[in-house]
Regions:
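ATP-binding catalytic core of ATPases
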Residues: 1-9
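Flexible loop/turn segments at secondary-structure boundaries
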Residues: 15-16, 68
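Charged regulatory segments coupled to nucleotide-binding catalytic modules in large multidomain enzymes
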Residues: 25-219
Length: 219
């Protein structure tokens, strides 16, 4: 478990995979925090890993209890204008919302305390902030497929070469940049080539020349 704080899911200590976001000088999550009535909130939206799309979505903690995990439903704004429904192109999206109150009854929990009450006035006030964070991150994620064959290499390179931070650390982190701004990493195929120590060269040659080169390579 992440040091200094125990996270619970349905009353049990959570020992599963860490919720991690990329954080570096040129990759900084969207974030905002404040208070609505007696509820304190801290919201972070950014980039996570690839290869496990089921981990994509929103994670909502109420008094350090995880009540919504990897949610991509309308409860967290997905598929509700102007937010699109979840798509594999958004698999790197990670959103984390921390809600804290001295009075548990003031938190936007369902009667079973195992989910989020989307009709709560507190939650309805925060949802637009969540959507704004999604829009900022999606603007970047929508550009990656335009890289064509390099898209997956770029996603992998980001995850492998960018420092990461866990949910607990995020809650305690004092961000140095302004609120409600997502700092996206550079979208540059040359970066991928340098990381791979290779340069991709593509050009057309006559068929006979290509066959001759192939014969020499196989000799």
């Amino acid at each position: 478990m992440q040091k200094g704080l125990t996270i619970y899911l349905n009353g049990k200590p959570l020992s599963g995979k860490r919720v991690e976001l990329l954080l570096s000088d040129n990759t900084i999550p969207y974030h905002t925090e404040g208070r609505i009535d007696s509820v304190r909130y801290k919201l972070i939206a950014g980039l996570g890993g690839i290869g496990e799309p089921k981990l994509s979505g929103w994670y909502i903690y109420c008094n350090n209890r995880l009540v919504l995990e990897a949610d991509t439903s309308s409860i967290t704004g997905w598929g509700v204008q102007p937010i699109p429904k979840w798509h594999i192109n958004y698999a790197m999206f990670r959103g984390v919302l921390f809600l804290d109150s001295e009075e548990t009854l003031n938190l936007p929990l369902t009667t079973t305390k195992k989910g989020i009450d989307a009709t709560s006035e507190v939650y309805k006030a925060i949802l637009p902030l969540m959507k704004n964070g999604m829009i900022k991150v999606f603007e970047f994620l929508k550009k990656i497929p335009q890289m064509g064959d390099e898209a997956n290499d770029y996603r992998a390179m980001l995850w492998e070469n960018t420092p990461k931070i866990g949910a607990v650390e995020l809650k305690a982190l004092n961000f140095s940049n302004a609120e409600k701004i997502f700092v996206a990493p550079p979208l540059n195929t040359d970066v991928i080539a340098r990381k791979k120590n290779t340069v991709r060269i593509a050009y057309d040659v006559a068929k006979q020349t290509a066959e001759t080169a192939k014969e020499h390579a196989e000799a």
